[in-house]
Amino acid sequence: MKIARFMFGLEETWGVILGDSIHAISGIPYDIKNVGNRICSLSEVTLLAPLTLTNKVPAIAANYGEKDDRDGPGIFMKQPGTYAPHQGNIVYPRSCKSVIHEAEVGVVISKTARHISESDAMDYVMGYTCVNDVSAKETIESDLGKGLSMRWKHFDTFCPIGPHIETEIDDPGHLKIECFVNGELSAGGNTSEMIFGIPKLISWVSEVMTLQPGDIIPTGCPETAEINIGDVVEVRIEGIGSLVNNVIEDY
């Protein structure tokens, strides 16, 4: 099932995508009892990022590459001002000289989770979505001497998410991840290459903070590459979908 948040006219709501149409649902999307009778064509709606401004995005750092002896991965937050929808813009900050894309699988939480064991973790998953954890590359070197920099990950529009939540993924531990820039393959990998798997990530984050329905955990990026003003960036994840954004000049 593909669950999307969308705007129809002046109304913002959630719905289920069926073919070329979207069927509005009432209430919250995390516990769908039935699909409503109100149907819109996808061409008539604007897709929004599939979360609200009250939802958290605790993102995972350094989860690909050589395995090491860490107990768990690093965690950082993407603040609500970074959220951007499918077909929305990534604003290239005027103060930055190097910006990179990071294509990631986002795990969407279905119910309140705190101190969750790895063995129970998948019971708290609603589905999966595409995330682009955009980062200001040069701040990694220029700011990190002062502590983990807010500038690295937190410029406005630096977290496109979407286009929808896919609830039916048989094996999220083996998903192909690709990122295209202007139609050319720029980076790729597979979730099988993660150092820490999804159950570990959910458990690890739930020891730090209480996860709520709709929170999204980006699981890390296998490869990155630079993006520039005028680029069209596409995150494509097997079984989930395609998240497309335009890179525009700061305003």
Regions found by a protein language model. Give the residues of each.
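N-terminal non-catalytic cap/leader segment that marks the start of a structured domain
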Residues: 1-73, 168, 172, 178, ...
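Short hydrophobic-aromatic micro-motifs
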Residues: 5, 24, 57-60, 105-109, ...
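Catalytic-pocket segment enriched in acidic/His residues
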Residues: 37-40, 67-69, 135-251
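A generic local secondary-structure boundary/capping motif
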Residues: 48-49, 90-99, 113-120, 149-152, ...
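Residue "hotspots" at secondary-structure boundaries inside conserved domains
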Residues: 49, 56, 97-99, 203, ...
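Residue-level recognition of short, solvent-exposed, well-ordered loop/turn junctions
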Residues: 52, 100-102, 212, 228-229
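RNA pseudouridine synthases
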Residues: 63, 102, 106-109, 115-132
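Structural signature of FAD isoalloxazine-binding scaffolds in flavoprotein oxidoreductases
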Residues: 73-86, 101, 234-238
